[in-house]
Each structure stands twice: as structure tokens, then as C-alpha cells.
């Protein structure tokens, strides 16, 4: 019997802050389930402050030579709190060079009284002095000795993507680093395949986040289509291009509920399935992020919308997740008769049948570990991007009973925004091949242009058969000192720690 229930907690969809004890911090899956039992998922975003004894990395003194292969200058057009963000590819630079640039007079954080004052300056001056973002740097800064909440090895059901299908998509099931400066931004979006994500701010200045509760996500999509009519006509899921910036003032004026919160160094942010989020950096900083999954996500993955124009499409097979964790629905799903209905208020208990099944099959596989890219300090060119033919060949490992099943669709029942009706089967029905294009947008070199692009860089699928723990033959590289990835042994946490709602709370028109 599944321990799913409609969560009565957090009816206001406030962004919650969690402070787990050292014991609670030992079991990632169980603590995420606990957070959802408290209603954290209803906000679409939550903050987790690690125990004071915990450290991600002992020292960041040796990272200045890490290469940012494709820094992106974020150029904005628009007015009155509604902007489109374009990206211009810049020359490669090291983290040390980027830090110097971020702290220069041209790009440094302006004087401000508090976070609210800085936020006003951000939206008032967004059109001026285009910042440069060091985004999508493959690798991890977590020490090998860091076992708890090491984003490079969370041990969630997302591991099935690599273990069952041999699929590795950079930034989805391998970590990415993001080096930011004042005003660098991430536009409104949900995660690819509507996965969860986790973001750890290693060091530097804070990051402000905005989030729309999943049960109100459809309202944001409808507003975005009105504000960006050209983009919406060109792609039914154009928000996946990650180019639309909408200010909190505009959201308020249009009655869109949202929350806001500021992440500081040493804190985690967790986004939940179909949770739209956006934000900006206060100054030079470094964050690390990756996607992950829980059994509650599976039905989201089945119906996740897809970019219809191919600009930022990421899809992969849902077969392994349904076959292994929802065996009673597998045959029906293969016939296209499993019309998933997503309830955004639903919570998955920490003792759910799917989670128990995952732990049983996970135990003998833990010694495998996940493969990850090491950080590059010297680079001659970018990693090759898989072509459509390469992608097709890569996914043959998941044929017959392992066909892709990523559904698309946008309609949500307006009478009850918390319930999403069945989505039409289409490109992501069983039998559709997986693709792996993602990121802030598509890289300029993939679009055939030299300077700018409407989106931002695509997260790359690694070439078939490549052991990404080893350097690519195209790269002359040296790893950062110390192991970056480690297997973690999960143990059950003790009694759960009290939580609080964020100061920002949820904002909407009265």
C-alpha cells in the first residue's frame, strides 16, 4: 500500500526552511520525504541549512585555475518588468580571471542597504551593464570524504537512468558548477522532465530565488504566453528556453502567487517537480547543482511538457522507472492506457512502497557509484555534443521494454489548480527515443551562429561508451586536488527537526 496522501500541511504554500540535525542529515531520501510530509513541496522550493558540523569541502583555495569554457554575457531586452534574456558567448577564462572581472568596478555589486534595496536595484537596472555568467561547468567541488548530501552522489532513483539505460546527461545526472556575479540571472523555468533539483551555494555572495507553487504553475504559463506572444507561438513550452524574466511586481499585478527567499553560502535549495523558479546573484559566488528524483516524481515525468521547437528539448526513457517502481502499472503504461493524474498537493511518505523497493534494489548497486566529469584546468575545446544519430544509438540500450515515455502537454483543469488531468500522449509516449539537449539554452555553436543565441547553453549527453571519470581525448586536463565523488552509505535519521516558513512567505494580490 502506497503511503501517498493529500498534504494538509502548508496550505499557504510558503517557502519553508529546514534545519536537520546531524543524524537526520544522514538519509537524503528520507529527509526529502519528511520535508514533503510537512508540505514543503507545495511551495515548489525549500531551503535546507546543514548541521554546523557538516562541510562540503575543507578548502576552496585551489580552484582558481578551473576553466570556464564558455562564459555567457546575459543581454536583456524589454521593459516594465518583462524582459527577454539572450546570451552572448565569450572567450574562455579561469575562475581566477572571472573573480577578478566580477569584482571590477564595471561588474561589482552596487552599494545597498539590505537585500530588499539590492532587489530594487536589480529590477531597476536590469537593462544596463550586461553581466557575464560562468554557467554549466561540468564537475563537483564536494570533497570525496563528504558523504551526506554530496550532490554528485545522492543515491536517488534517478540513478536508474544510468544504471538501466546507460544514459548520462551533464547537469541532469552529473553535477554542474555555476560561477556568478552581480545581476547574473536564471529565468523562469521548471527542471527538465519536471525533475527535482538541488543547489548548494559553496561560497560567495547570496542568491535570491523566486518560486511559484506547482499548483499555480499553469497560471504562470498562461501569463507568460500573454507577455511573450511571439515566443509562445513558436514553441508550446517556450519557458523551457529559460529566457523569460518576469518581475515580482508584474506577478503581483496579475495575481500570480509566488514566494521569495535568499540563499546564503553554505545553504541548500531544493526545487520540487513542476515548481517554476527564477532568481539572480548578488555578486561573485559559486553554486553546484544537479537534478534528482523520488518515487513521487514518476507521474510528473510521464506527463512533463517538452520544448516543441527543439531549442531546449531534453527527454529520456521513463521505462525503467515504471517497470521497476510501478510494476503494477507497467503493462498498462506500455499500451498508452496509464493516463497519469498529477496532484500537486500529494505527499509521498518516507516508507512508501516505491521507496522501499528502490532501497532493496539499490543496496547491491551502491558499489558501482555514479560516473562524473572531473573539473578541467586546461582545455583546448568543448566536449563534443551528441548528434541526433548519436543520441538514437545511445538509447538503443533501452529498446523494447526500455522505450522512452516522456509525455508532453500543457492543459491543467482550471476549476482545481492542484489537479492536472491526463496529458495527451505524443512525442514522449512509449517508443519515443530519448534526447539530451538542455541547459540555460542551446550553445551558439550548435545553432550555427557565432555571437549570440536566444537561449543559453545546452547540457550535453556524453558520448556512448565513454568513461567520464577519464579525460576526453579532446581535452588536456588536470583534476582539482582531492577526490570529488564518493559513495555514501545511507542510514535512517532520528526524530525530525522542527521547520520554519521563510520570511518572504507567499505573495499574491489580496
Curated annotation (Swiss-Prot):
EC numbers for this chain: 1.14.11.66
EC primary class: oxidoreductase
UniProt cross-references to Gene3D superfamilies, sorted A to Z: Cupin
Binding site for Fe cation: 189, 191, 277
Biological process terms in GO annotation: cellular response to ionizing radiation; chromatin remodeling; DNA damage response; double-strand break repair via homologous recombination; inflammatory response; positive regulation of double-strand break repair via nonhomologous end joining; regulation of gene expression
Binding site for Zn(2+): 235, 241, 307, 309
Residue ranges occupied by any JmjN domain in the UniProt entry: 15-57
Boundaries of every JmjC domain copy: 143-309
Matching InterPro entries: JmjC_dom (IPR003347), JmjN (IPR003349)
Amino acid composition bias (Basic and acidic residues), ranges on this chain: 461-471
Annotated keywords: ADP-ribosylation, Chromatin regulator, Dioxygenase, Iron, Metal-binding, Nucleus, Oxidoreductase, Transcription, Transcription regulation, Ubl conjugation, Zinc
Compartments, record wording: Nucleus
Cofactor note: Binds 1 Fe(2+) ion per subunit.
A GO molecular function held by the record: histone H3K9me2/H3K9me3 demethylase activity
Main localization (coarse): nucleus
Modified residues (PolyADP-ribosyl glutamic acid): 23-24
Region of interest: Disordered: 397-510
Reactions this protein catalyses: N(6),N(6),N(6)-trimethyl-L-lysyl(9)-[histone H3] + 2 2-oxoglutarate + 2 O2 = N(6)-methyl-L-lysyl(9)-[histone H3] + 2 formaldehyde + 2 succinate + 2 CO2
Cofactor(s) demanded: Fe(2+)
Residue positions binding 2-oxoglutarate: 133, 199, 207, 242
Entry function: Histone demethylase that specifically demethylates 'Lys-9' of histone H3, thereby playing a central role in histone code. Does not demethylate histone H3 'Lys-4', H3 'Lys-27', H3 'Lys-36' nor H4 'Lys-20'. Demethylates both di- and trimethylated H3 'Lys-9' residue, while it has no activity on monomethylated residues. Demethylation of Lys residue generates formaldehyde and succinate.
Protein family (similarity comment): Belongs to the JHDM3 histone demethylase family.
Protein name: Lysine-specific demethylase 4D
Organism of origin: Rattus norvegicus (Rat)
Gene encoding the protein: Kdm4d
